[in-house]
Amino acid sequence: MNSKHITLRPITRKDYPFIEDIIRKTWKYDALSSNPKDAKHMARLYLRSCLLRATFSCVAAVDGKVLGVILAGSKKSVPKFALRRTLAQLWSIALLFTTKTGRDIGKFFSTFDQTDVELLKNAGNAFDAEICFFAVDESTRGTGIGKMLFAKALDYLEQEGTKTLYLFTDSSCTYQFYEKRGMQRLGEKTVEFSPHTDYRLNMFIYGLELQAAS
C-alpha cells in the first residue's frame, strides 16, 4: 500500500460504521451471540465508551474508507462533546439490552470493565495518559498504518507533557507490537465467557515512560 494514498486525520461521525466493523471483526463479536444485531450493538457501545475518554483521535483512510484508528486520552485535557457522547453511549446500552442475548453480553462487558479496573489498580494507577483504543483493519496489517497512527498519538501526548501512559490489550490482538516499541507488560488476567460458544481472552495492561522512549 502506497503511503501517499493514506490520509491521516481526526475522526468524524461518518467514520463510526467503518470503525465499528473493525471492532466487530477484531474481537469476533459475532461468535458471542446467535443474534447478529448484538455484535453490531456491542461494537457501537465499545466505540462510544472509548470516545468518552478520548482527547485525541486519528484515523487512517484510503479512498474514503477508514482502515485504522487510534484514540488517546490525556489527563491534562478535557474530552470534547462529553454530553453528546454520554447520551450516545446510553443509547447504545439500551439497544444492546433489548434482547436476552444482548443482556448476557452486557454482563460480559461488565466483566471486562472490572478486569480493566483491577489491572490498572495493580499497576499503580499513576499514569498521565491512556491509549483508549487502537486497531487497524486486518487487511492492512503489516503495511505500516499502525506505526503511523501510534506515532501520531505519541506526538500528541508528548506535546501534552505526558510522562507515563498505559493501554489495555489482549491475546486476540498483536500485543507484540507494543513490546517492540518499548512498552512493558504490567499485569495480565484471563477472562472466560460462554453464552453460546467458548470465549477466552488473556487481558493485559502495558505501560510506557515517554522520556525513556524518546
Per-range role (PLM):
Residues 6-21, 74:
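A short beta-loop-alpha structural element at the N-terminal edge
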Residues 27-46, 86-88, 99:
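Conserved GNAT-fold acetyl-CoA-binding loop/helix
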Residues 36-57, 62, 67, 71, ...:
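Active-site rim helix/loop that mediates acceptor-substrate recognition in acyltransferases
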